[in-house]
């Protein structure tokens, strides 16, 4: 039985329609032309803990650590200015060509090894795992020389836009509630571009250690005055156009080796309801409860390597399926499994029969070796009105590089033309040279890799190209050998001779 009742619920209207983000496969036509491109051997060398400033007798030494990001900005040639094997491949009036990345291999040299990091004045007080008795709050400096093997990380991010990282930094305070000296400042999660040379999370957290740790001894030397960033996978995965991360490879491993508490005073006391007070013997007042662990990356094996392997991109995690806008590609790498630091000793005096430490000096260096290889597919875009409007909304510089813009009408005004230009009596008539377009990423630091002259159609001449041909099932045509082929007459006579032997 149907009963009528008054409407006691709210009326919800549908949300306003928004423009739809389309996948690149909906407006891009892929051709059957593939190119191989590879870099040379990329080597960097420096001090693993801090940069050495320049002096009058020595050049500056950069900081090169296995716990830094390596962000390669790969420059690609403009396919619209390329000498193509098929001139009828596209119509320059209505089409444009772009590169699509379908294969990548990041090569790593140098042996596997563990590089230690540490601090000669590390802020550790008690061993809180095997503590025998509480010692009370110490007032003297008991910092000690401590080294750790940091968290093990292997990472590779592929995209056509710079990667995004996150870390904890000092937040802004309200004007009516200032922070007194000695109080904990407010924190905020900061998102920023990951640049080449930025420090990774080594197991002590992703934060601005230079701004948030005044003791300068709570973490190892290589990060005590740095900002450790962690890739913002959530933000890059939610990228509207999917340019920051086509896909990524990641392997992290860590466990806690030692457990300590900190030496300095505690800013926030434990509430009395949380414990029963001690009766002396070093238990009143109680010790610091600011605990910290030293990380360890554990064992390193070749079975767990993500580098020196080819990877094929069939479907990206975002809307950009490997299209390299602005003819550039960003490769972000981290590999702590090859973190061995080279120790070098030199003699300051003649070597004596007995060992004298003052006669020698010790130095430490770290080197890295990379190689980048790619397989690119030539793709075509038909520039309809909808596609051009979509690309302009995504990135206006794409159409500017394709020479699309407003055409100014011819000038109808009368212009001046001097006869004698190069003399002191006439005003200078030299035109101001046009300024180059500013690079929107010039303020960031990347490792530039120029591949504009390293493209090749002969895929079977390169290791990654042969792997790609095997992957897609294309067989190479055998080349004619040096042996001269047999003539038809000799082959017919030999076959007839064989038939005669059979008749006998």
Swiss-Prot record:
Keywords: Capsid protein, Disulfide bond, Host nucleus, Host-virus interaction, Late protein, T=7 icosahedral capsid protein, Viral attachment to host cell, Viral penetration into host cytoplasm, Virion, Virus endocytosis by host, Virus entry into host cell. The keyword Zinc-finger does not apply. One of its GO terms (cellular component) is host cell nucleus. It comes from the Viruses. One of its GO terms (biological process) is virion attachment to host cell. Residues 486-496 have a biased composition (Low complexity). One of its GO terms (molecular function) is structural molecule activity. Its main location: virion. SUPFAM superfamilies: Group I dsDNA viruses. InterPro entries: Capsid_L1_Papillomavir, Capsid_L1_sf_Papillomavir, dsDNA_vir_gr_I_capsid. Pfam families: Late_protein_L1. Residues 476-504 are annotated as: Disordered. Self-assembles into homopentamers. The capsid has an icosahedral symmetry and consists of 72 capsomers, with each capsomer being a pentamer of L1. Interacts with the minor capsid protein L2; this interaction is necessary for viral genome encapsidation. Interacts with protein E2; this interaction enhances E2-dependent replication and transcription activation. Belongs to the papillomaviridae L1 protein family. This is Major capsid protein L1. It comes from Human papillomavirus 51. The lineage of its organism: Viruses, Monodnaviria, Shotokuvirae, Cossaviricota, Papovaviricetes. The gene is L1.
């Amino acid at each position: 039985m149907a009963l009528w009742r008054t409407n006691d619920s709210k009326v919800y209207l549908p949300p306003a329609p928004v423009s739809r983000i389309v996948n690149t496969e909906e407006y891009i036509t892929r051709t059957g032309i593939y190119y191989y491109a590879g870099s040379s051997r990329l080597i960097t060398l420096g001090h693993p803990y801090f940069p050495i400033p320049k002096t009058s007798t020595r050049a500056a030494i950069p900081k090169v650590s296995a716990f830094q990001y390596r962000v390669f900005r790969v420059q690609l040639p403009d396919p619209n200015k390329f000498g193509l094997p098929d001139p009828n491949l596209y119509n320059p009036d209505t089409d444009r060509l772009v590169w699509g990345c379908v294969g990548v291999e990041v090569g790593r040299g140098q042996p596997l090894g563990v590089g230690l990091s540490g601090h000669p004045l590390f802020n550790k007080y008690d061993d809180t795992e095997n503590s025998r008795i509480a010692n009370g709050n110490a007032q003297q400096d008991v910092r000690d020389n401590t080294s750790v093997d940091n968290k093990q990380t292997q990472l590779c991010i592929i995209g056509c836009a710079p990667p995004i990282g996150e870390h904890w930094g000092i937040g802004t305070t309200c004007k009516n509630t200032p922070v007194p000296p000695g109080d904990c400042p407010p924190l905020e999660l900061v998102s920023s571009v990951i640049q080449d040379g930025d420090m990774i999370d080594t197991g002590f957290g992703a934060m601005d250690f230079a701004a948030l740790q005044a003791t300068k001894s709570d973490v190892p030397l290589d990060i005590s005055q740095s900002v450790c960033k962690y890739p913002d996978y959530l933000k890059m995965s939610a990228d509207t156009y999917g340019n920051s991360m086509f896909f990524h490879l990641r392997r992290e491993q860590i466990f806690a080796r030692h457990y300590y508490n900190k030496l300095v005073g505690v800013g926030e006391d434990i509430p009395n309801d949380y414990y029963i007070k001690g009766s002396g013997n070093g238990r009143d007042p109680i010790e610091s409860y600011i605990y910290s662990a030293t990380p360890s990356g554990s064992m390193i094996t070749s079975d767990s390597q993500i580098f020196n392997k080819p990877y094929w991109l069939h479907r990206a995690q975002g809307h950009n399926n490997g299209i390299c806008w602005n003819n550039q590609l960003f490769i972000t790498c981290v590999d702590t499994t090859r973190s061995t630091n080279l120790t070098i000793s030199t003699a300051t005096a003649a070597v004596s029969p007995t060992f004298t430490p003052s006669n020698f000096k010790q130095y430490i260096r770290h080197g890295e070796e990379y190689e980048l290889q790619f397989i690119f597919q030539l793709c075509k875009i038909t520039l309809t009105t909808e596609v051009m409007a979509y690309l302009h909304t995504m990135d206006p510089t794409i159409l500017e590089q394709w020479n699309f813009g407003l055409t100014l009408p011819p000038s109808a005004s009368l212009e001046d033309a001097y006869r004698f230009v190069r003399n002191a009596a006439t005003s200078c008539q030299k035109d101001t040279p046009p300024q180059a377009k500013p690079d929107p990423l010039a303020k960031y630091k990347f490792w530039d890799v120029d591949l504009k002259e390293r493209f090749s159609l002969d895929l079977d001449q390169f290791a990654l190209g042969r792997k790609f041909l095997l992957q897609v099932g294309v067989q190479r045509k055998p080349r004619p050998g040096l042996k001269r082929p047999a003539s038809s007459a000799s082959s017919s006579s030999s076959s007839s001779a064989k038939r005669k032997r059979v008749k006998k």
